[in-house]
Curated annotation (Swiss-Prot):
Coiled coil: none
GO cellular component, one term: HslUV protease complex
GO MF entries: ATP binding; ATP hydrolysis activity; ATP-dependent protein folding chaperone; protein dimerization activity; unfolded protein binding; zinc ion binding
Lineage of producing organism: Bacteria, Bacillati, Bacillota, Bacilli, Lactobacillales
ClpX-type ZB domain mapped to chain residues: 1-52
Keyword hit for ATP-binding: yes
Keyword vocabulary terms for this entry: ATP-binding, Chaperone, Metal-binding, Nucleotide-binding, Zinc
Entry binding sites for Zn(2+): 11, 14, 33, 36
Residues noted as binding ATP in the record, renumbered to the chain: 117-124
SUPFAM superfamilies membership: Glucocorticoid receptor-like (DNA-binding domain), P-loop containing nucleoside triphosphate hydrolases
Name assigned to this protein: ATP-dependent Clp protease ATP-binding subunit ClpX
Keyword Zinc: yes
PROSITE patterns in the record: CLPX_ZB (PS51902)
Amino acid sequence: MSNTQNPNIHCSFCGKSQDDVKKMIAGSDVYICNECIELSTRILEEELKEEQDSEMLEVKTPKEMFDHLNEYVIGQEKAKRALAVAVYNHYKRINFTASKIAEDIELQKSNILLIGPTGSGKTFLAQTLAKSLNVPFAIADATSLTEAGYVGEDVENILLKLLQASDFNIERAEHGIIYIDEIDKIAKKSENVSITRDVSGEGVQQALLKIIEGTVASVPPQGGRKHPNQEMIQIDTKNILFIVGGAFDGIEEIVKQRLGEKIIGFGANNKKLSDEDSYMQEIIAEDIQKFGLIPEFIGRLPIVAALERLTEEDLIQILTEPKNALIKQYKQLLLFDNVELEFKDGALMAIAKKAIERKTGARGLRSIIEEVMMDIMFEVPSHEEITKVIITEAVIDGKAEPEMIREADKK
């Protein structure tokens, strides 16, 4: 291309002559003036900005996320707040990176560690958040993972689950959330948690480190072990949010020991927790390291949130209040057969007590109700005369049968 001085030449786009513009660029039988070039550049820049803006994720505020969690999750206020802020900052970071506002600033990922007893709602919290954000979500069990050379799953199979959840849309998967449960089980095998650490467990932690901190991983599309000549899917994990959780049974003793030593060494100015207080809320990185997680792994999980053990009152609320409350679900199932279902207060309390006795927390509630409801749901559809079923405390304890009210009984 070149500039030309022929006054008879006109711009092929706007029609202006050589004399009306500063520059005229010649191509193969076409000409374009400097004004059209400037206009085209502005149009391209605007279109690129629109594309960039469309790539930015719509992020709910921490308050909006917290309110959404409150609709489904009872209690755990501190954990819900910590999660909402961490998730908000994570997706704000992705948008910040996409906007290229400040290329000289690098924001680190806010991966999260949830510590709490079985059935306290760790998995459900992560699942509910992902659903509210409309991002792909996958759950993995750390106990099924092994390092290279051992029988078991490669850590890359976690990413395969996320790809499957996103219908193999790699771009969506790269903005998803992965929850890894039972992370405490790869920390140790010995009961003496402060001295011995399981070697293969440490190997799994090392393998997880790479994908958690951000890397381009090769994922076998069919799962299983990787082998030569197998086609791989490349997925960048730098924008995937990892939430890991575990019960960390016994970590309270490590916290007690640390706090006790401080009191002996520095006098009464240090805080001493009473038996009623939750030591879980006092956990720091040092305690988690003593439990058996390696420092590098802990360093990739900057947000630590402790969940409290659920009380009877919490479990009763879980049964009755959330949008997806189990009692509401069972009532609706029977309502499809025009039958009213009533759980007496004593029955709800008995269900909660059983869950606490079994140490299953909220996740054990459904199985307790199923034990009672199975026969009812089997019989009711065959008896059109039944209009109401009443469940009492004695029914839950196996000492009585459910009360069935029939149409004839009302007359």
